[in-house]
A protein has these predicted regions:
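Conserved Class I SAM-dependent methyltransferase catalytic core
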Residues: 8, 14, 18, 22, ...
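Short SAM/SAH-binding signature in class I
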Residues: 308-314
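Short amphipathic alpha-helix with an adjacent loop that forms part of the alpha/beta core around
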Residues: 93-95, 301-307
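C-terminal edge-of-domain segments
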Residues: 151-167
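Conserved S-adenosyl-L-methionine
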Residues: 185-304, 319-320, 324-326
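A short, flexible beta-alpha/helix-coil linker loop
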Residues: 109-112, 170, 316-320
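Non-catalytic nucleic-acid substrate-recognition regions in nucleic-acid-modifying enzymes
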Residues: 2-147
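SAM-dependent Rossmann-like transferase core, predominantly class I methyltransferases
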Residues: 162-196
Length: 384
């Protein structure tokens, strides 16, 4: 006779944390550090089980994730009509107020649901028809830019899950990368690259081509134990079961983990004066306590000093017409510079120019594939 199974804990809730492909392992480790149970790693997602406090903690504390979804209903998505019927069966009026402004998006893929706009339309009809019937004709308004409630239809093969995006605004929008030069790296990718670079989070860290500083700022927050999203608004705050007291307790719990870095050293070099001004402004306004030294100049003409054993870098890819002849020499110079100033050390270098990456030299240990927008980038981990 099989052993009886324990009844499900009504306070435990399923969830999905969405991320870039290649960062599933990093996100799973971050969740464990936040004491949130990881059920399974999936493609571009990590399944979790937690409580309300865990959802709040995940949103404030995750570094390499994009969104935290809280499922409402899952079903077999054989056709578009089922999207409507399942949306229609959900008691939305008990979950958030009719005055809320809502946005609906599709995430994932399904062989049966291929027309994204029509799928969104059917879910929208199901939600608004439910409100009209149960709220005397009133219904939420659709707001794409700044919604109160973000509803996601998460597709996985033949299954669909209606879920709240408890994050609201994507988690990579920390609030400090409001202006920048060139093509900026998003914060979730930067945090993931630092985590995968094998830097120990305590030794000096060098970025010889730091741009607007995202890699260094994320690295400092990791080392200092600073949760990246403590002071922003989240989607879960618009739901009826939002608990302000628990939210405050979890914020205090995360703040208690912060630590001072009296002997830490971070150095960023940037050649472009305009980008450097933006970099200094971000540092001054958002990271005044960070022990990050910034220098404007060409790394090839700048001595970083002794003591560096680790570096992270996101050099130009040379994808624009006319740049091809400049990138290979630049990558050779970068490799020679790191070999000179990181004796016995290692670097994590991220690029989408895989042909030129061979010019770094050193001892290439391995690489990790991580997309940067439409580009197939890789993090090359090189020992010098």
């Amino acid at each position: 006779m099989p052993a009886p199974t324990a009844p499900p804990d009504p306070e435990r809730l399923p969830g999905f944390v969405l991320c870039r492909g290649g960062l599933e392992g990093v996100v799973a480790e971050e969740l464990r550090d936040l004491e949130i149970a990881v059920v399974e790693k999936r493609k571009r997602a990590v399944e979790i089980e937690t409580d309300l406090a865990g959802f709040y903690r995940a949103n404030m504390g995750l570094r390499s994730a994009l969104n935290v979804l809280r499922p409402i209903r899952s079903f077999n998505a054989r056709n578009y009509d089922l999207l409507y019927y399942q949306s229609r069966k959900t008691n939305w009026h008990k979950l958030f107020p009719v005055e809320a402004r809502i946005r609906i998006d599709i995430k994932g893929h399904s062989p049966k649901i291929t027309h994204t706009r029509y799928a969104i339309h059917r879910v929208k009809d199901g939600i608004t028809d439910t409100f009209r019937k149960l709220c005397e004709g009133a219904r939420p308004t659709i707001e794409k830019r700044d919604p109160d409630v973000h509803i996601v239809v998460y597709l996985e093969k033949h299954r669909a899950t209606l879920a709240f995006d408890t994050s609201g605004v994507p988690l990579f929008k920390r609030g400090y990368r409001l202006e920048h030069g060139g093509a900026p790296m998003k914060e979730d990718l930067a945090a993931g690259l630092v985590a995968l670079s094998r830097w120990d989070r305590c030794s000096p860290l060098l970025d010889p081509m730091c741009g607007s500083g995202t890699l260094l700022f994320e690295a400092w927050m990791m080392a200092a134990g600073i949760a990246p999203n403590l002071h922003r608004r989240f989607g879960f705050e618009s739901l009826y079961d939002y608990d302000r007291e628990i939210h405050g307790q979890e914020r205090n719990r995360l703040q208690a983990k912060e630590r001072s870095l009296h002997e830490a050293r971070f150095l960023g070099l940037e050649i472009d004066p305009r980008t450097f001004k933006t970099l200094e402004r971000i540092r001054r306004e958002h990271f005044p306590r960070a022990p990050i030294e910034l220098k404007c100049g060409d790394f090839r003409k700048t001595d970083p000093g002794s003591g560096f054993r680790s570096a992270v870098c996101n050099p130009p890819y040379g994808m624009r017409s006319g740049d091809e002849g400049l990138i290979s020499p630049l990558y050779e110079d970068l490799g020679a510079y790191l070999r000179q100033h990181l004796p016995g050390g290692q670097a994590g270098i991220y690029t989408a120019n895989h042909e030129a990456a061979a010019r770094f030299g050193g001892d290439p240990e391995d690489s990790v594939s991580l997309r940067n927008g439409s580009l197939e980038g890789r993090l090359y981990r090189v020992a010098f």
